[in-house]
Amino acid sequence: METKLVLALIACGVICLLQTTPTEATGKHVQQLMKVFRAIDFDFTKKAFYLHRAKYGVQNQLRNPLYLKAMSLPRSAKLSQPCLKKMIDEVNDLESTFYAGFSFNCHDHDQYSMDCLEAAEPTYLDGLKKLAASTEQCLVQK
C-alpha cells in the first residue's frame, strides 16, 4: 500500500516537472518586452483622462497579448529587436492620431471633450489590435 502511494507521488512530481519546464525562459522574454514597453513615451502634459485611455489601450490591446505570446516561447527563442522598434514607432503614430482625433481634428464635438475621445478611441484600439497581430508574426528572430 505504501509503495503505491510513493509511486503515485513520484508520478505526480514528474508530471508537474514536465509542465513547468517549457516556461523556464518566460521571465527573460517578458522582461525584455517590459523594457520595450517602458520606452513608449507618453506626453504627460496632455489631459489625464486622455492619457489614462491611451495607456489602457496599449496595456490591454498590445502588451497583454504579446506577454502571453512571450510566455509560450522556448528558451532558445530570441526576440526580434527591429520588430519591437517598429512596433514602438507604430504605437507612437497611433497615439498621435488618437490625440489628433481627440483634439484639433474633432469636428463633430467640442475639442478636448469626452465625446471626441469616445469618437476617436475605437480607431485607436483597432489599430493596436492589428499592431499586436502583426508584431506576433515577427516577434521571434529567425
Swiss-Prot record:
Coiled-coil spans in chain: none
Positions of disulphide bridges: C83-C138, C106-C116
Protein name: gSG7 salivary protein
Subunit architecture: Interacts with host coagulation factor XII (F12) (inactive and activated). Interacts with host high molecular weight kininogen (KNG1) (inactive and activated).
Regulation: Zn(2+) modulates binding to host coagulation factor XII (F12) and high molecular weight kininogen (KNG1).
Gene Ontology MF terms: toxin activity
Cellular component annotations (GO), alphabetically ordered: extracellular region
Keyword field: Blood coagulation cascade inhibiting toxin, Complement system impairing toxin, Disulfide bond, Hemostasis impairing toxin, Secreted, Signal, Toxin
A Pfam family per the record: Aegyptin_C
Keyword Phosphoprotein among record annotations: no
Described purpose of this protein according to its UniProt entry: Salivary protein with anticoagulant activity. Inhibits activation of host kallikrein-kinin system by preventing the reciprocal activation of coagulation factor XII (F12) and prekallikrein (KLKB1), and subsequent release of bradykinin. Inhibits host factor XII and high molecular weight kininogen (KNG1) binding to negatively charged surfaces. Weakly inhibits the alternative pathway of complement system activation in the host.
Subcellular localization: Secreted
Signal peptide: 1-25
